[in-house]
């Protein structure tokens, strides 16, 4: 099944003429072509989708006609907020994995490495507390912490841990045994990924659900109250 946001009224401005549809992938005229990404030819999490005179029954309409933008933004906000739990746990686990990999090597006493590691630990704690604050506010019926901030900190935090591992471990970052973790934020059977694999895969998190650039724009306008550029 696909959730598609389609233009249903071309005569209204901007976001008003979009509707949300559930589309069966077996529908005649619809073709999904999986394609590999940086993680390798067997990593097929993404597809390009083609529609050739596809007909979708009206019962597949989600919500009201031309109300798709509200549904889209609501779904994205929910996704960004709920993924906070995975981002937070994944960040803690990745940092612990890196500390284990460094062990008692000279890096464990390197000031530059320790400074970067300390910054990541602070960011991980800030992410956790920000998420808890948002949940507490929701329980009281108040506005939650901005979901875009949670998404931005979580996804970029995973990338930054992997980047530090690459800088610190050098060629060892290509060794799958150096990156093994019981926590698998990228999906089942990928817990043996090397730090290099983790680094490549981390970019998916900074793109899906709205890129980091989009999140920064949202934070600037809706949280900080800055004017639209």
Regions found by a protein language model. Name each.
Residues 10-12, 38-45, 189-190, 209:
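Short Gly/Pro-enriched turn/cap motifs at secondary-structure boundaries
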């Amino acid at each position: 099944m696909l959730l598609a946001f389609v233009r249903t009224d071309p005569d209204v401005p901007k976001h008003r003429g979009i509707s949300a549809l559930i589309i069966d992938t077996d529908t005649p005229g619809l073709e999904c072509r999986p394609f590999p990404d940086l993680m390798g030819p067997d990593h097929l999490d993404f597809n390009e989708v083609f529609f050739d005179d596809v007909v979708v029954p009206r019962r597949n309409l989600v919500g009201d006609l031309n109300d798709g933008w509200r549904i889209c933004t609501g779904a994205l906000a929910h996704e960004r907020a709920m993924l906070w739990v995975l981002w937070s746990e994944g960040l803690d686990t990745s940092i612990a994995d890196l500390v284990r990999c460094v062990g008692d090597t000279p890096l464990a006493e390197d000031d530059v490495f320790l400074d970067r590691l300390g910054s990541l630990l602070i960011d991980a704690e800030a992410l956790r507390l920000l998420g808890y604050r948002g949940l507490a506010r929701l329980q009281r019926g108040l506005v939650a912490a901005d979901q875009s901030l949670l998404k931005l900190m979580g996804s970029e935090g995973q990338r930054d841990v992997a980047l530090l591992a690459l800088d610190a471990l050098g060629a060892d970052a290509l060794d799958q045994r150096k990156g093994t973790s019981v926590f698998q934020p990228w999906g089942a059977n990928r817990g043996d990924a090397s730090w290099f694999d983790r680094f490549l895969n981390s970019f998916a998190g900074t793109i899906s659900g709205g890129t980091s650039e989009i999140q920064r724009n949202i934070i600037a306008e809706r949280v900080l109250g800055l004017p639209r550029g």
